[in-house]
Amino acid sequence: MQTLQKLSNRLFYLPPVQKTDRPILAAIVGDDQTLLIDSGNSSNHAKHFKAQLASYQIKGNILALTHWHWDHVFGLSEMNMPSIANSMTYDKIKEIQKFSWEDKELDERVEAGIEIPFCADAIKLELGNEREVVIPDPTIIFDGKLELNLGGVTCIIEHVGGDHSPDSNLLYIPEEKALFLGDCLYANMYAEKWHYTVEKMEKLLEKIEGYDAKIYFLSHHPGPLGRDEFGSFVSLLKICGELTGKYSGNHKAIVGEMSSLLGRKLTEDDLEVVGYFVGGYE
């Protein structure tokens, strides 16, 4: 089981679990309120997070969702506190509240193209035989941007969208220079080909770079990224996006010039990013 990590008196996070697609969960501890980031992918995930927080005498008061995907909202009922979502996330939650998560219905949605095998398999693994999922309505609904004063520390929540999920939010903690990006920099998985689009990526990176952060959280990355490491990832995305436009999505040409620009052979991760941009080029 994952152990809660303390980065400061204000900032704690629980690392992700790849096998069952558990994302990072986090707590921002203010003098008056404690904000939790995402609810987890099951009641068990949420319970584990709450127990880990309790070992530091921390209890959440309010929770913010990064987006609507199952692994971020299935723990919402167990969290049992007011929650914050943008209106797009709210609408998607209302939609999936009606779903059954039993094998038969999951498999039917995969067959219909509503669900994807990756998520269906992870849901079956995480939930086991406990398939009754209750997702309560989010409490506070916003559009655009919202600022929270937790007492001695603040949080800015901004709806930024992106390829992965149009409802994606980022959360910025100015006093900690910490930026939680949820899944917004990941590819669109609900498509025939997992992909990035050049235009959406450019707009998203512009918004992200407007925040003065020194520590960055991607929900399924093992731990936070420092400024240099995150900057390298952003540079890769920018170069790949530019070359995708320049070469009209020609994989071979993009790989050739990218390798030349970087002065090295591309890694598997590099090639995955190239593949996503090529997959999204129209």
Regions found by a protein language model. Give the residues of each.
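Active-site metal-binding motif and surrounding structural segment of the metallo-beta-lactamase
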Residues: 44-89, 212
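Conserved beta-strand hairpin/beta-sheet module of binuclear metal-dependent hydrolase folds
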Residues: 2-51, 169-183
